[in-house]
């Protein structure tokens, strides 16, 4: 096969792997009321259907990228797709809440293995700047549209078949990705296991995150100042402190401390976590609001979010890139975040009697336009000062904070809103808190990301082969 054709087909394969991950990050949202009814979840514990996935995904991203450097990225990618596919089938057969949570955790672990090496595979396959930009545009489109597409697919499958099929749908996609990936993706020469894998660091950070989220999720039942909540959160902070101490002393740490000194990466990563908190809350709470508060079916809920999906796709198809070249990434990012704040504010003030059109429709269109305008600038700015030798580490760190921050934010906002309000008022409070999170992201951009509004590129400070 022609080498150039093989590279582009390999890109399609890894994008299918990423699409499967993004679909599954949101496809369960519209099915949550059905899952809650069938498996007996409480309202607070229902967030674990989402958070078990997100915590495992975020907790193992860094170590997945490192293992890919050591033993080969194709091996890790295919292992992740295999585990994700098997866990999806297991989740589909779940007959109890505990079984589903375990399945979702394993899905997150498989997703982290494959996602942790995808960017490194793309960077290695596409070494010329123009080609790499084209490849990353395709990858960004998959990230931007995949999660929203999951809402529509979840609604259709839940309404016309049953909620179990939101997991079974991954089987044909996973099998195709495994077969084509083994054929098309070239293996990199691993550094060897003698370089060391920071498994202790991965265990510490994952345990810290899970304890923290569990403490927040159960705070509604035990109280925010109860020994149960304070003990779990304190243990989480203690494990986090041990993790930081360990990483500062290891020769080959999971997260080298030098990464924390890159201003643009830290600022953009913080803004990204706050942004995705708002988006996670919108899709999670919005699905419950439309079905419980307005009586929508699962499929109708998916259709209600379709304007958001379409606007994200439209903006990510090239419009955002052209606007960024014209006005700069920082200006476009600020406009996008402002649009999301406005959309969430509209949703928080939409009374129970407000019709879908024009109020909710306008909010969902504005939300999609804002999100589609924010993703590419955030990715661009976050990597603008990261040396290419640390590109994988930088992108992995950003993804970890985004996923885990979003999961913690979702758990916190859901817990706070349900403990302080009931019925429609709880939904309203959740939207207000989500809007405040995105507004905080805008403040971070204004205060921290003081980059010039010109094209921002990754600094070519190391050979491509060193990219992690």
Where on the chain are the PLM-derived regions?
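Short helix-kink/termination motifs in transmembrane helices of multi-pass secondary transporters
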Residues: 20-31, 56-59, 73, 166, ...
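C-terminal membrane-cytosol helix-exit motif in multi-pass small-molecule transporters
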Residues: 171-190, 206-218, 235-250, 441-451
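Flexible interhelical linker loops that connect adjacent transmembrane helices
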Residues: 178-206, 248-266, 325, 389, ...
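12-transmembrane solute porter fold
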Residues: 8-23, 28-30, 43, 227-239, ...
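Interfacial loop-to-helix junctions that mark the boundaries of transmembrane helices
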Residues: 45, 98-106, 162-169, 195-198, ...
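Short loop segments and helix-boundary regions at transmembrane helix junctions
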Residues: 5-8, 128, 184-202, 223-226, ...
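Alpha-helical transmembrane segments
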Residues: 82, 204-209, 338
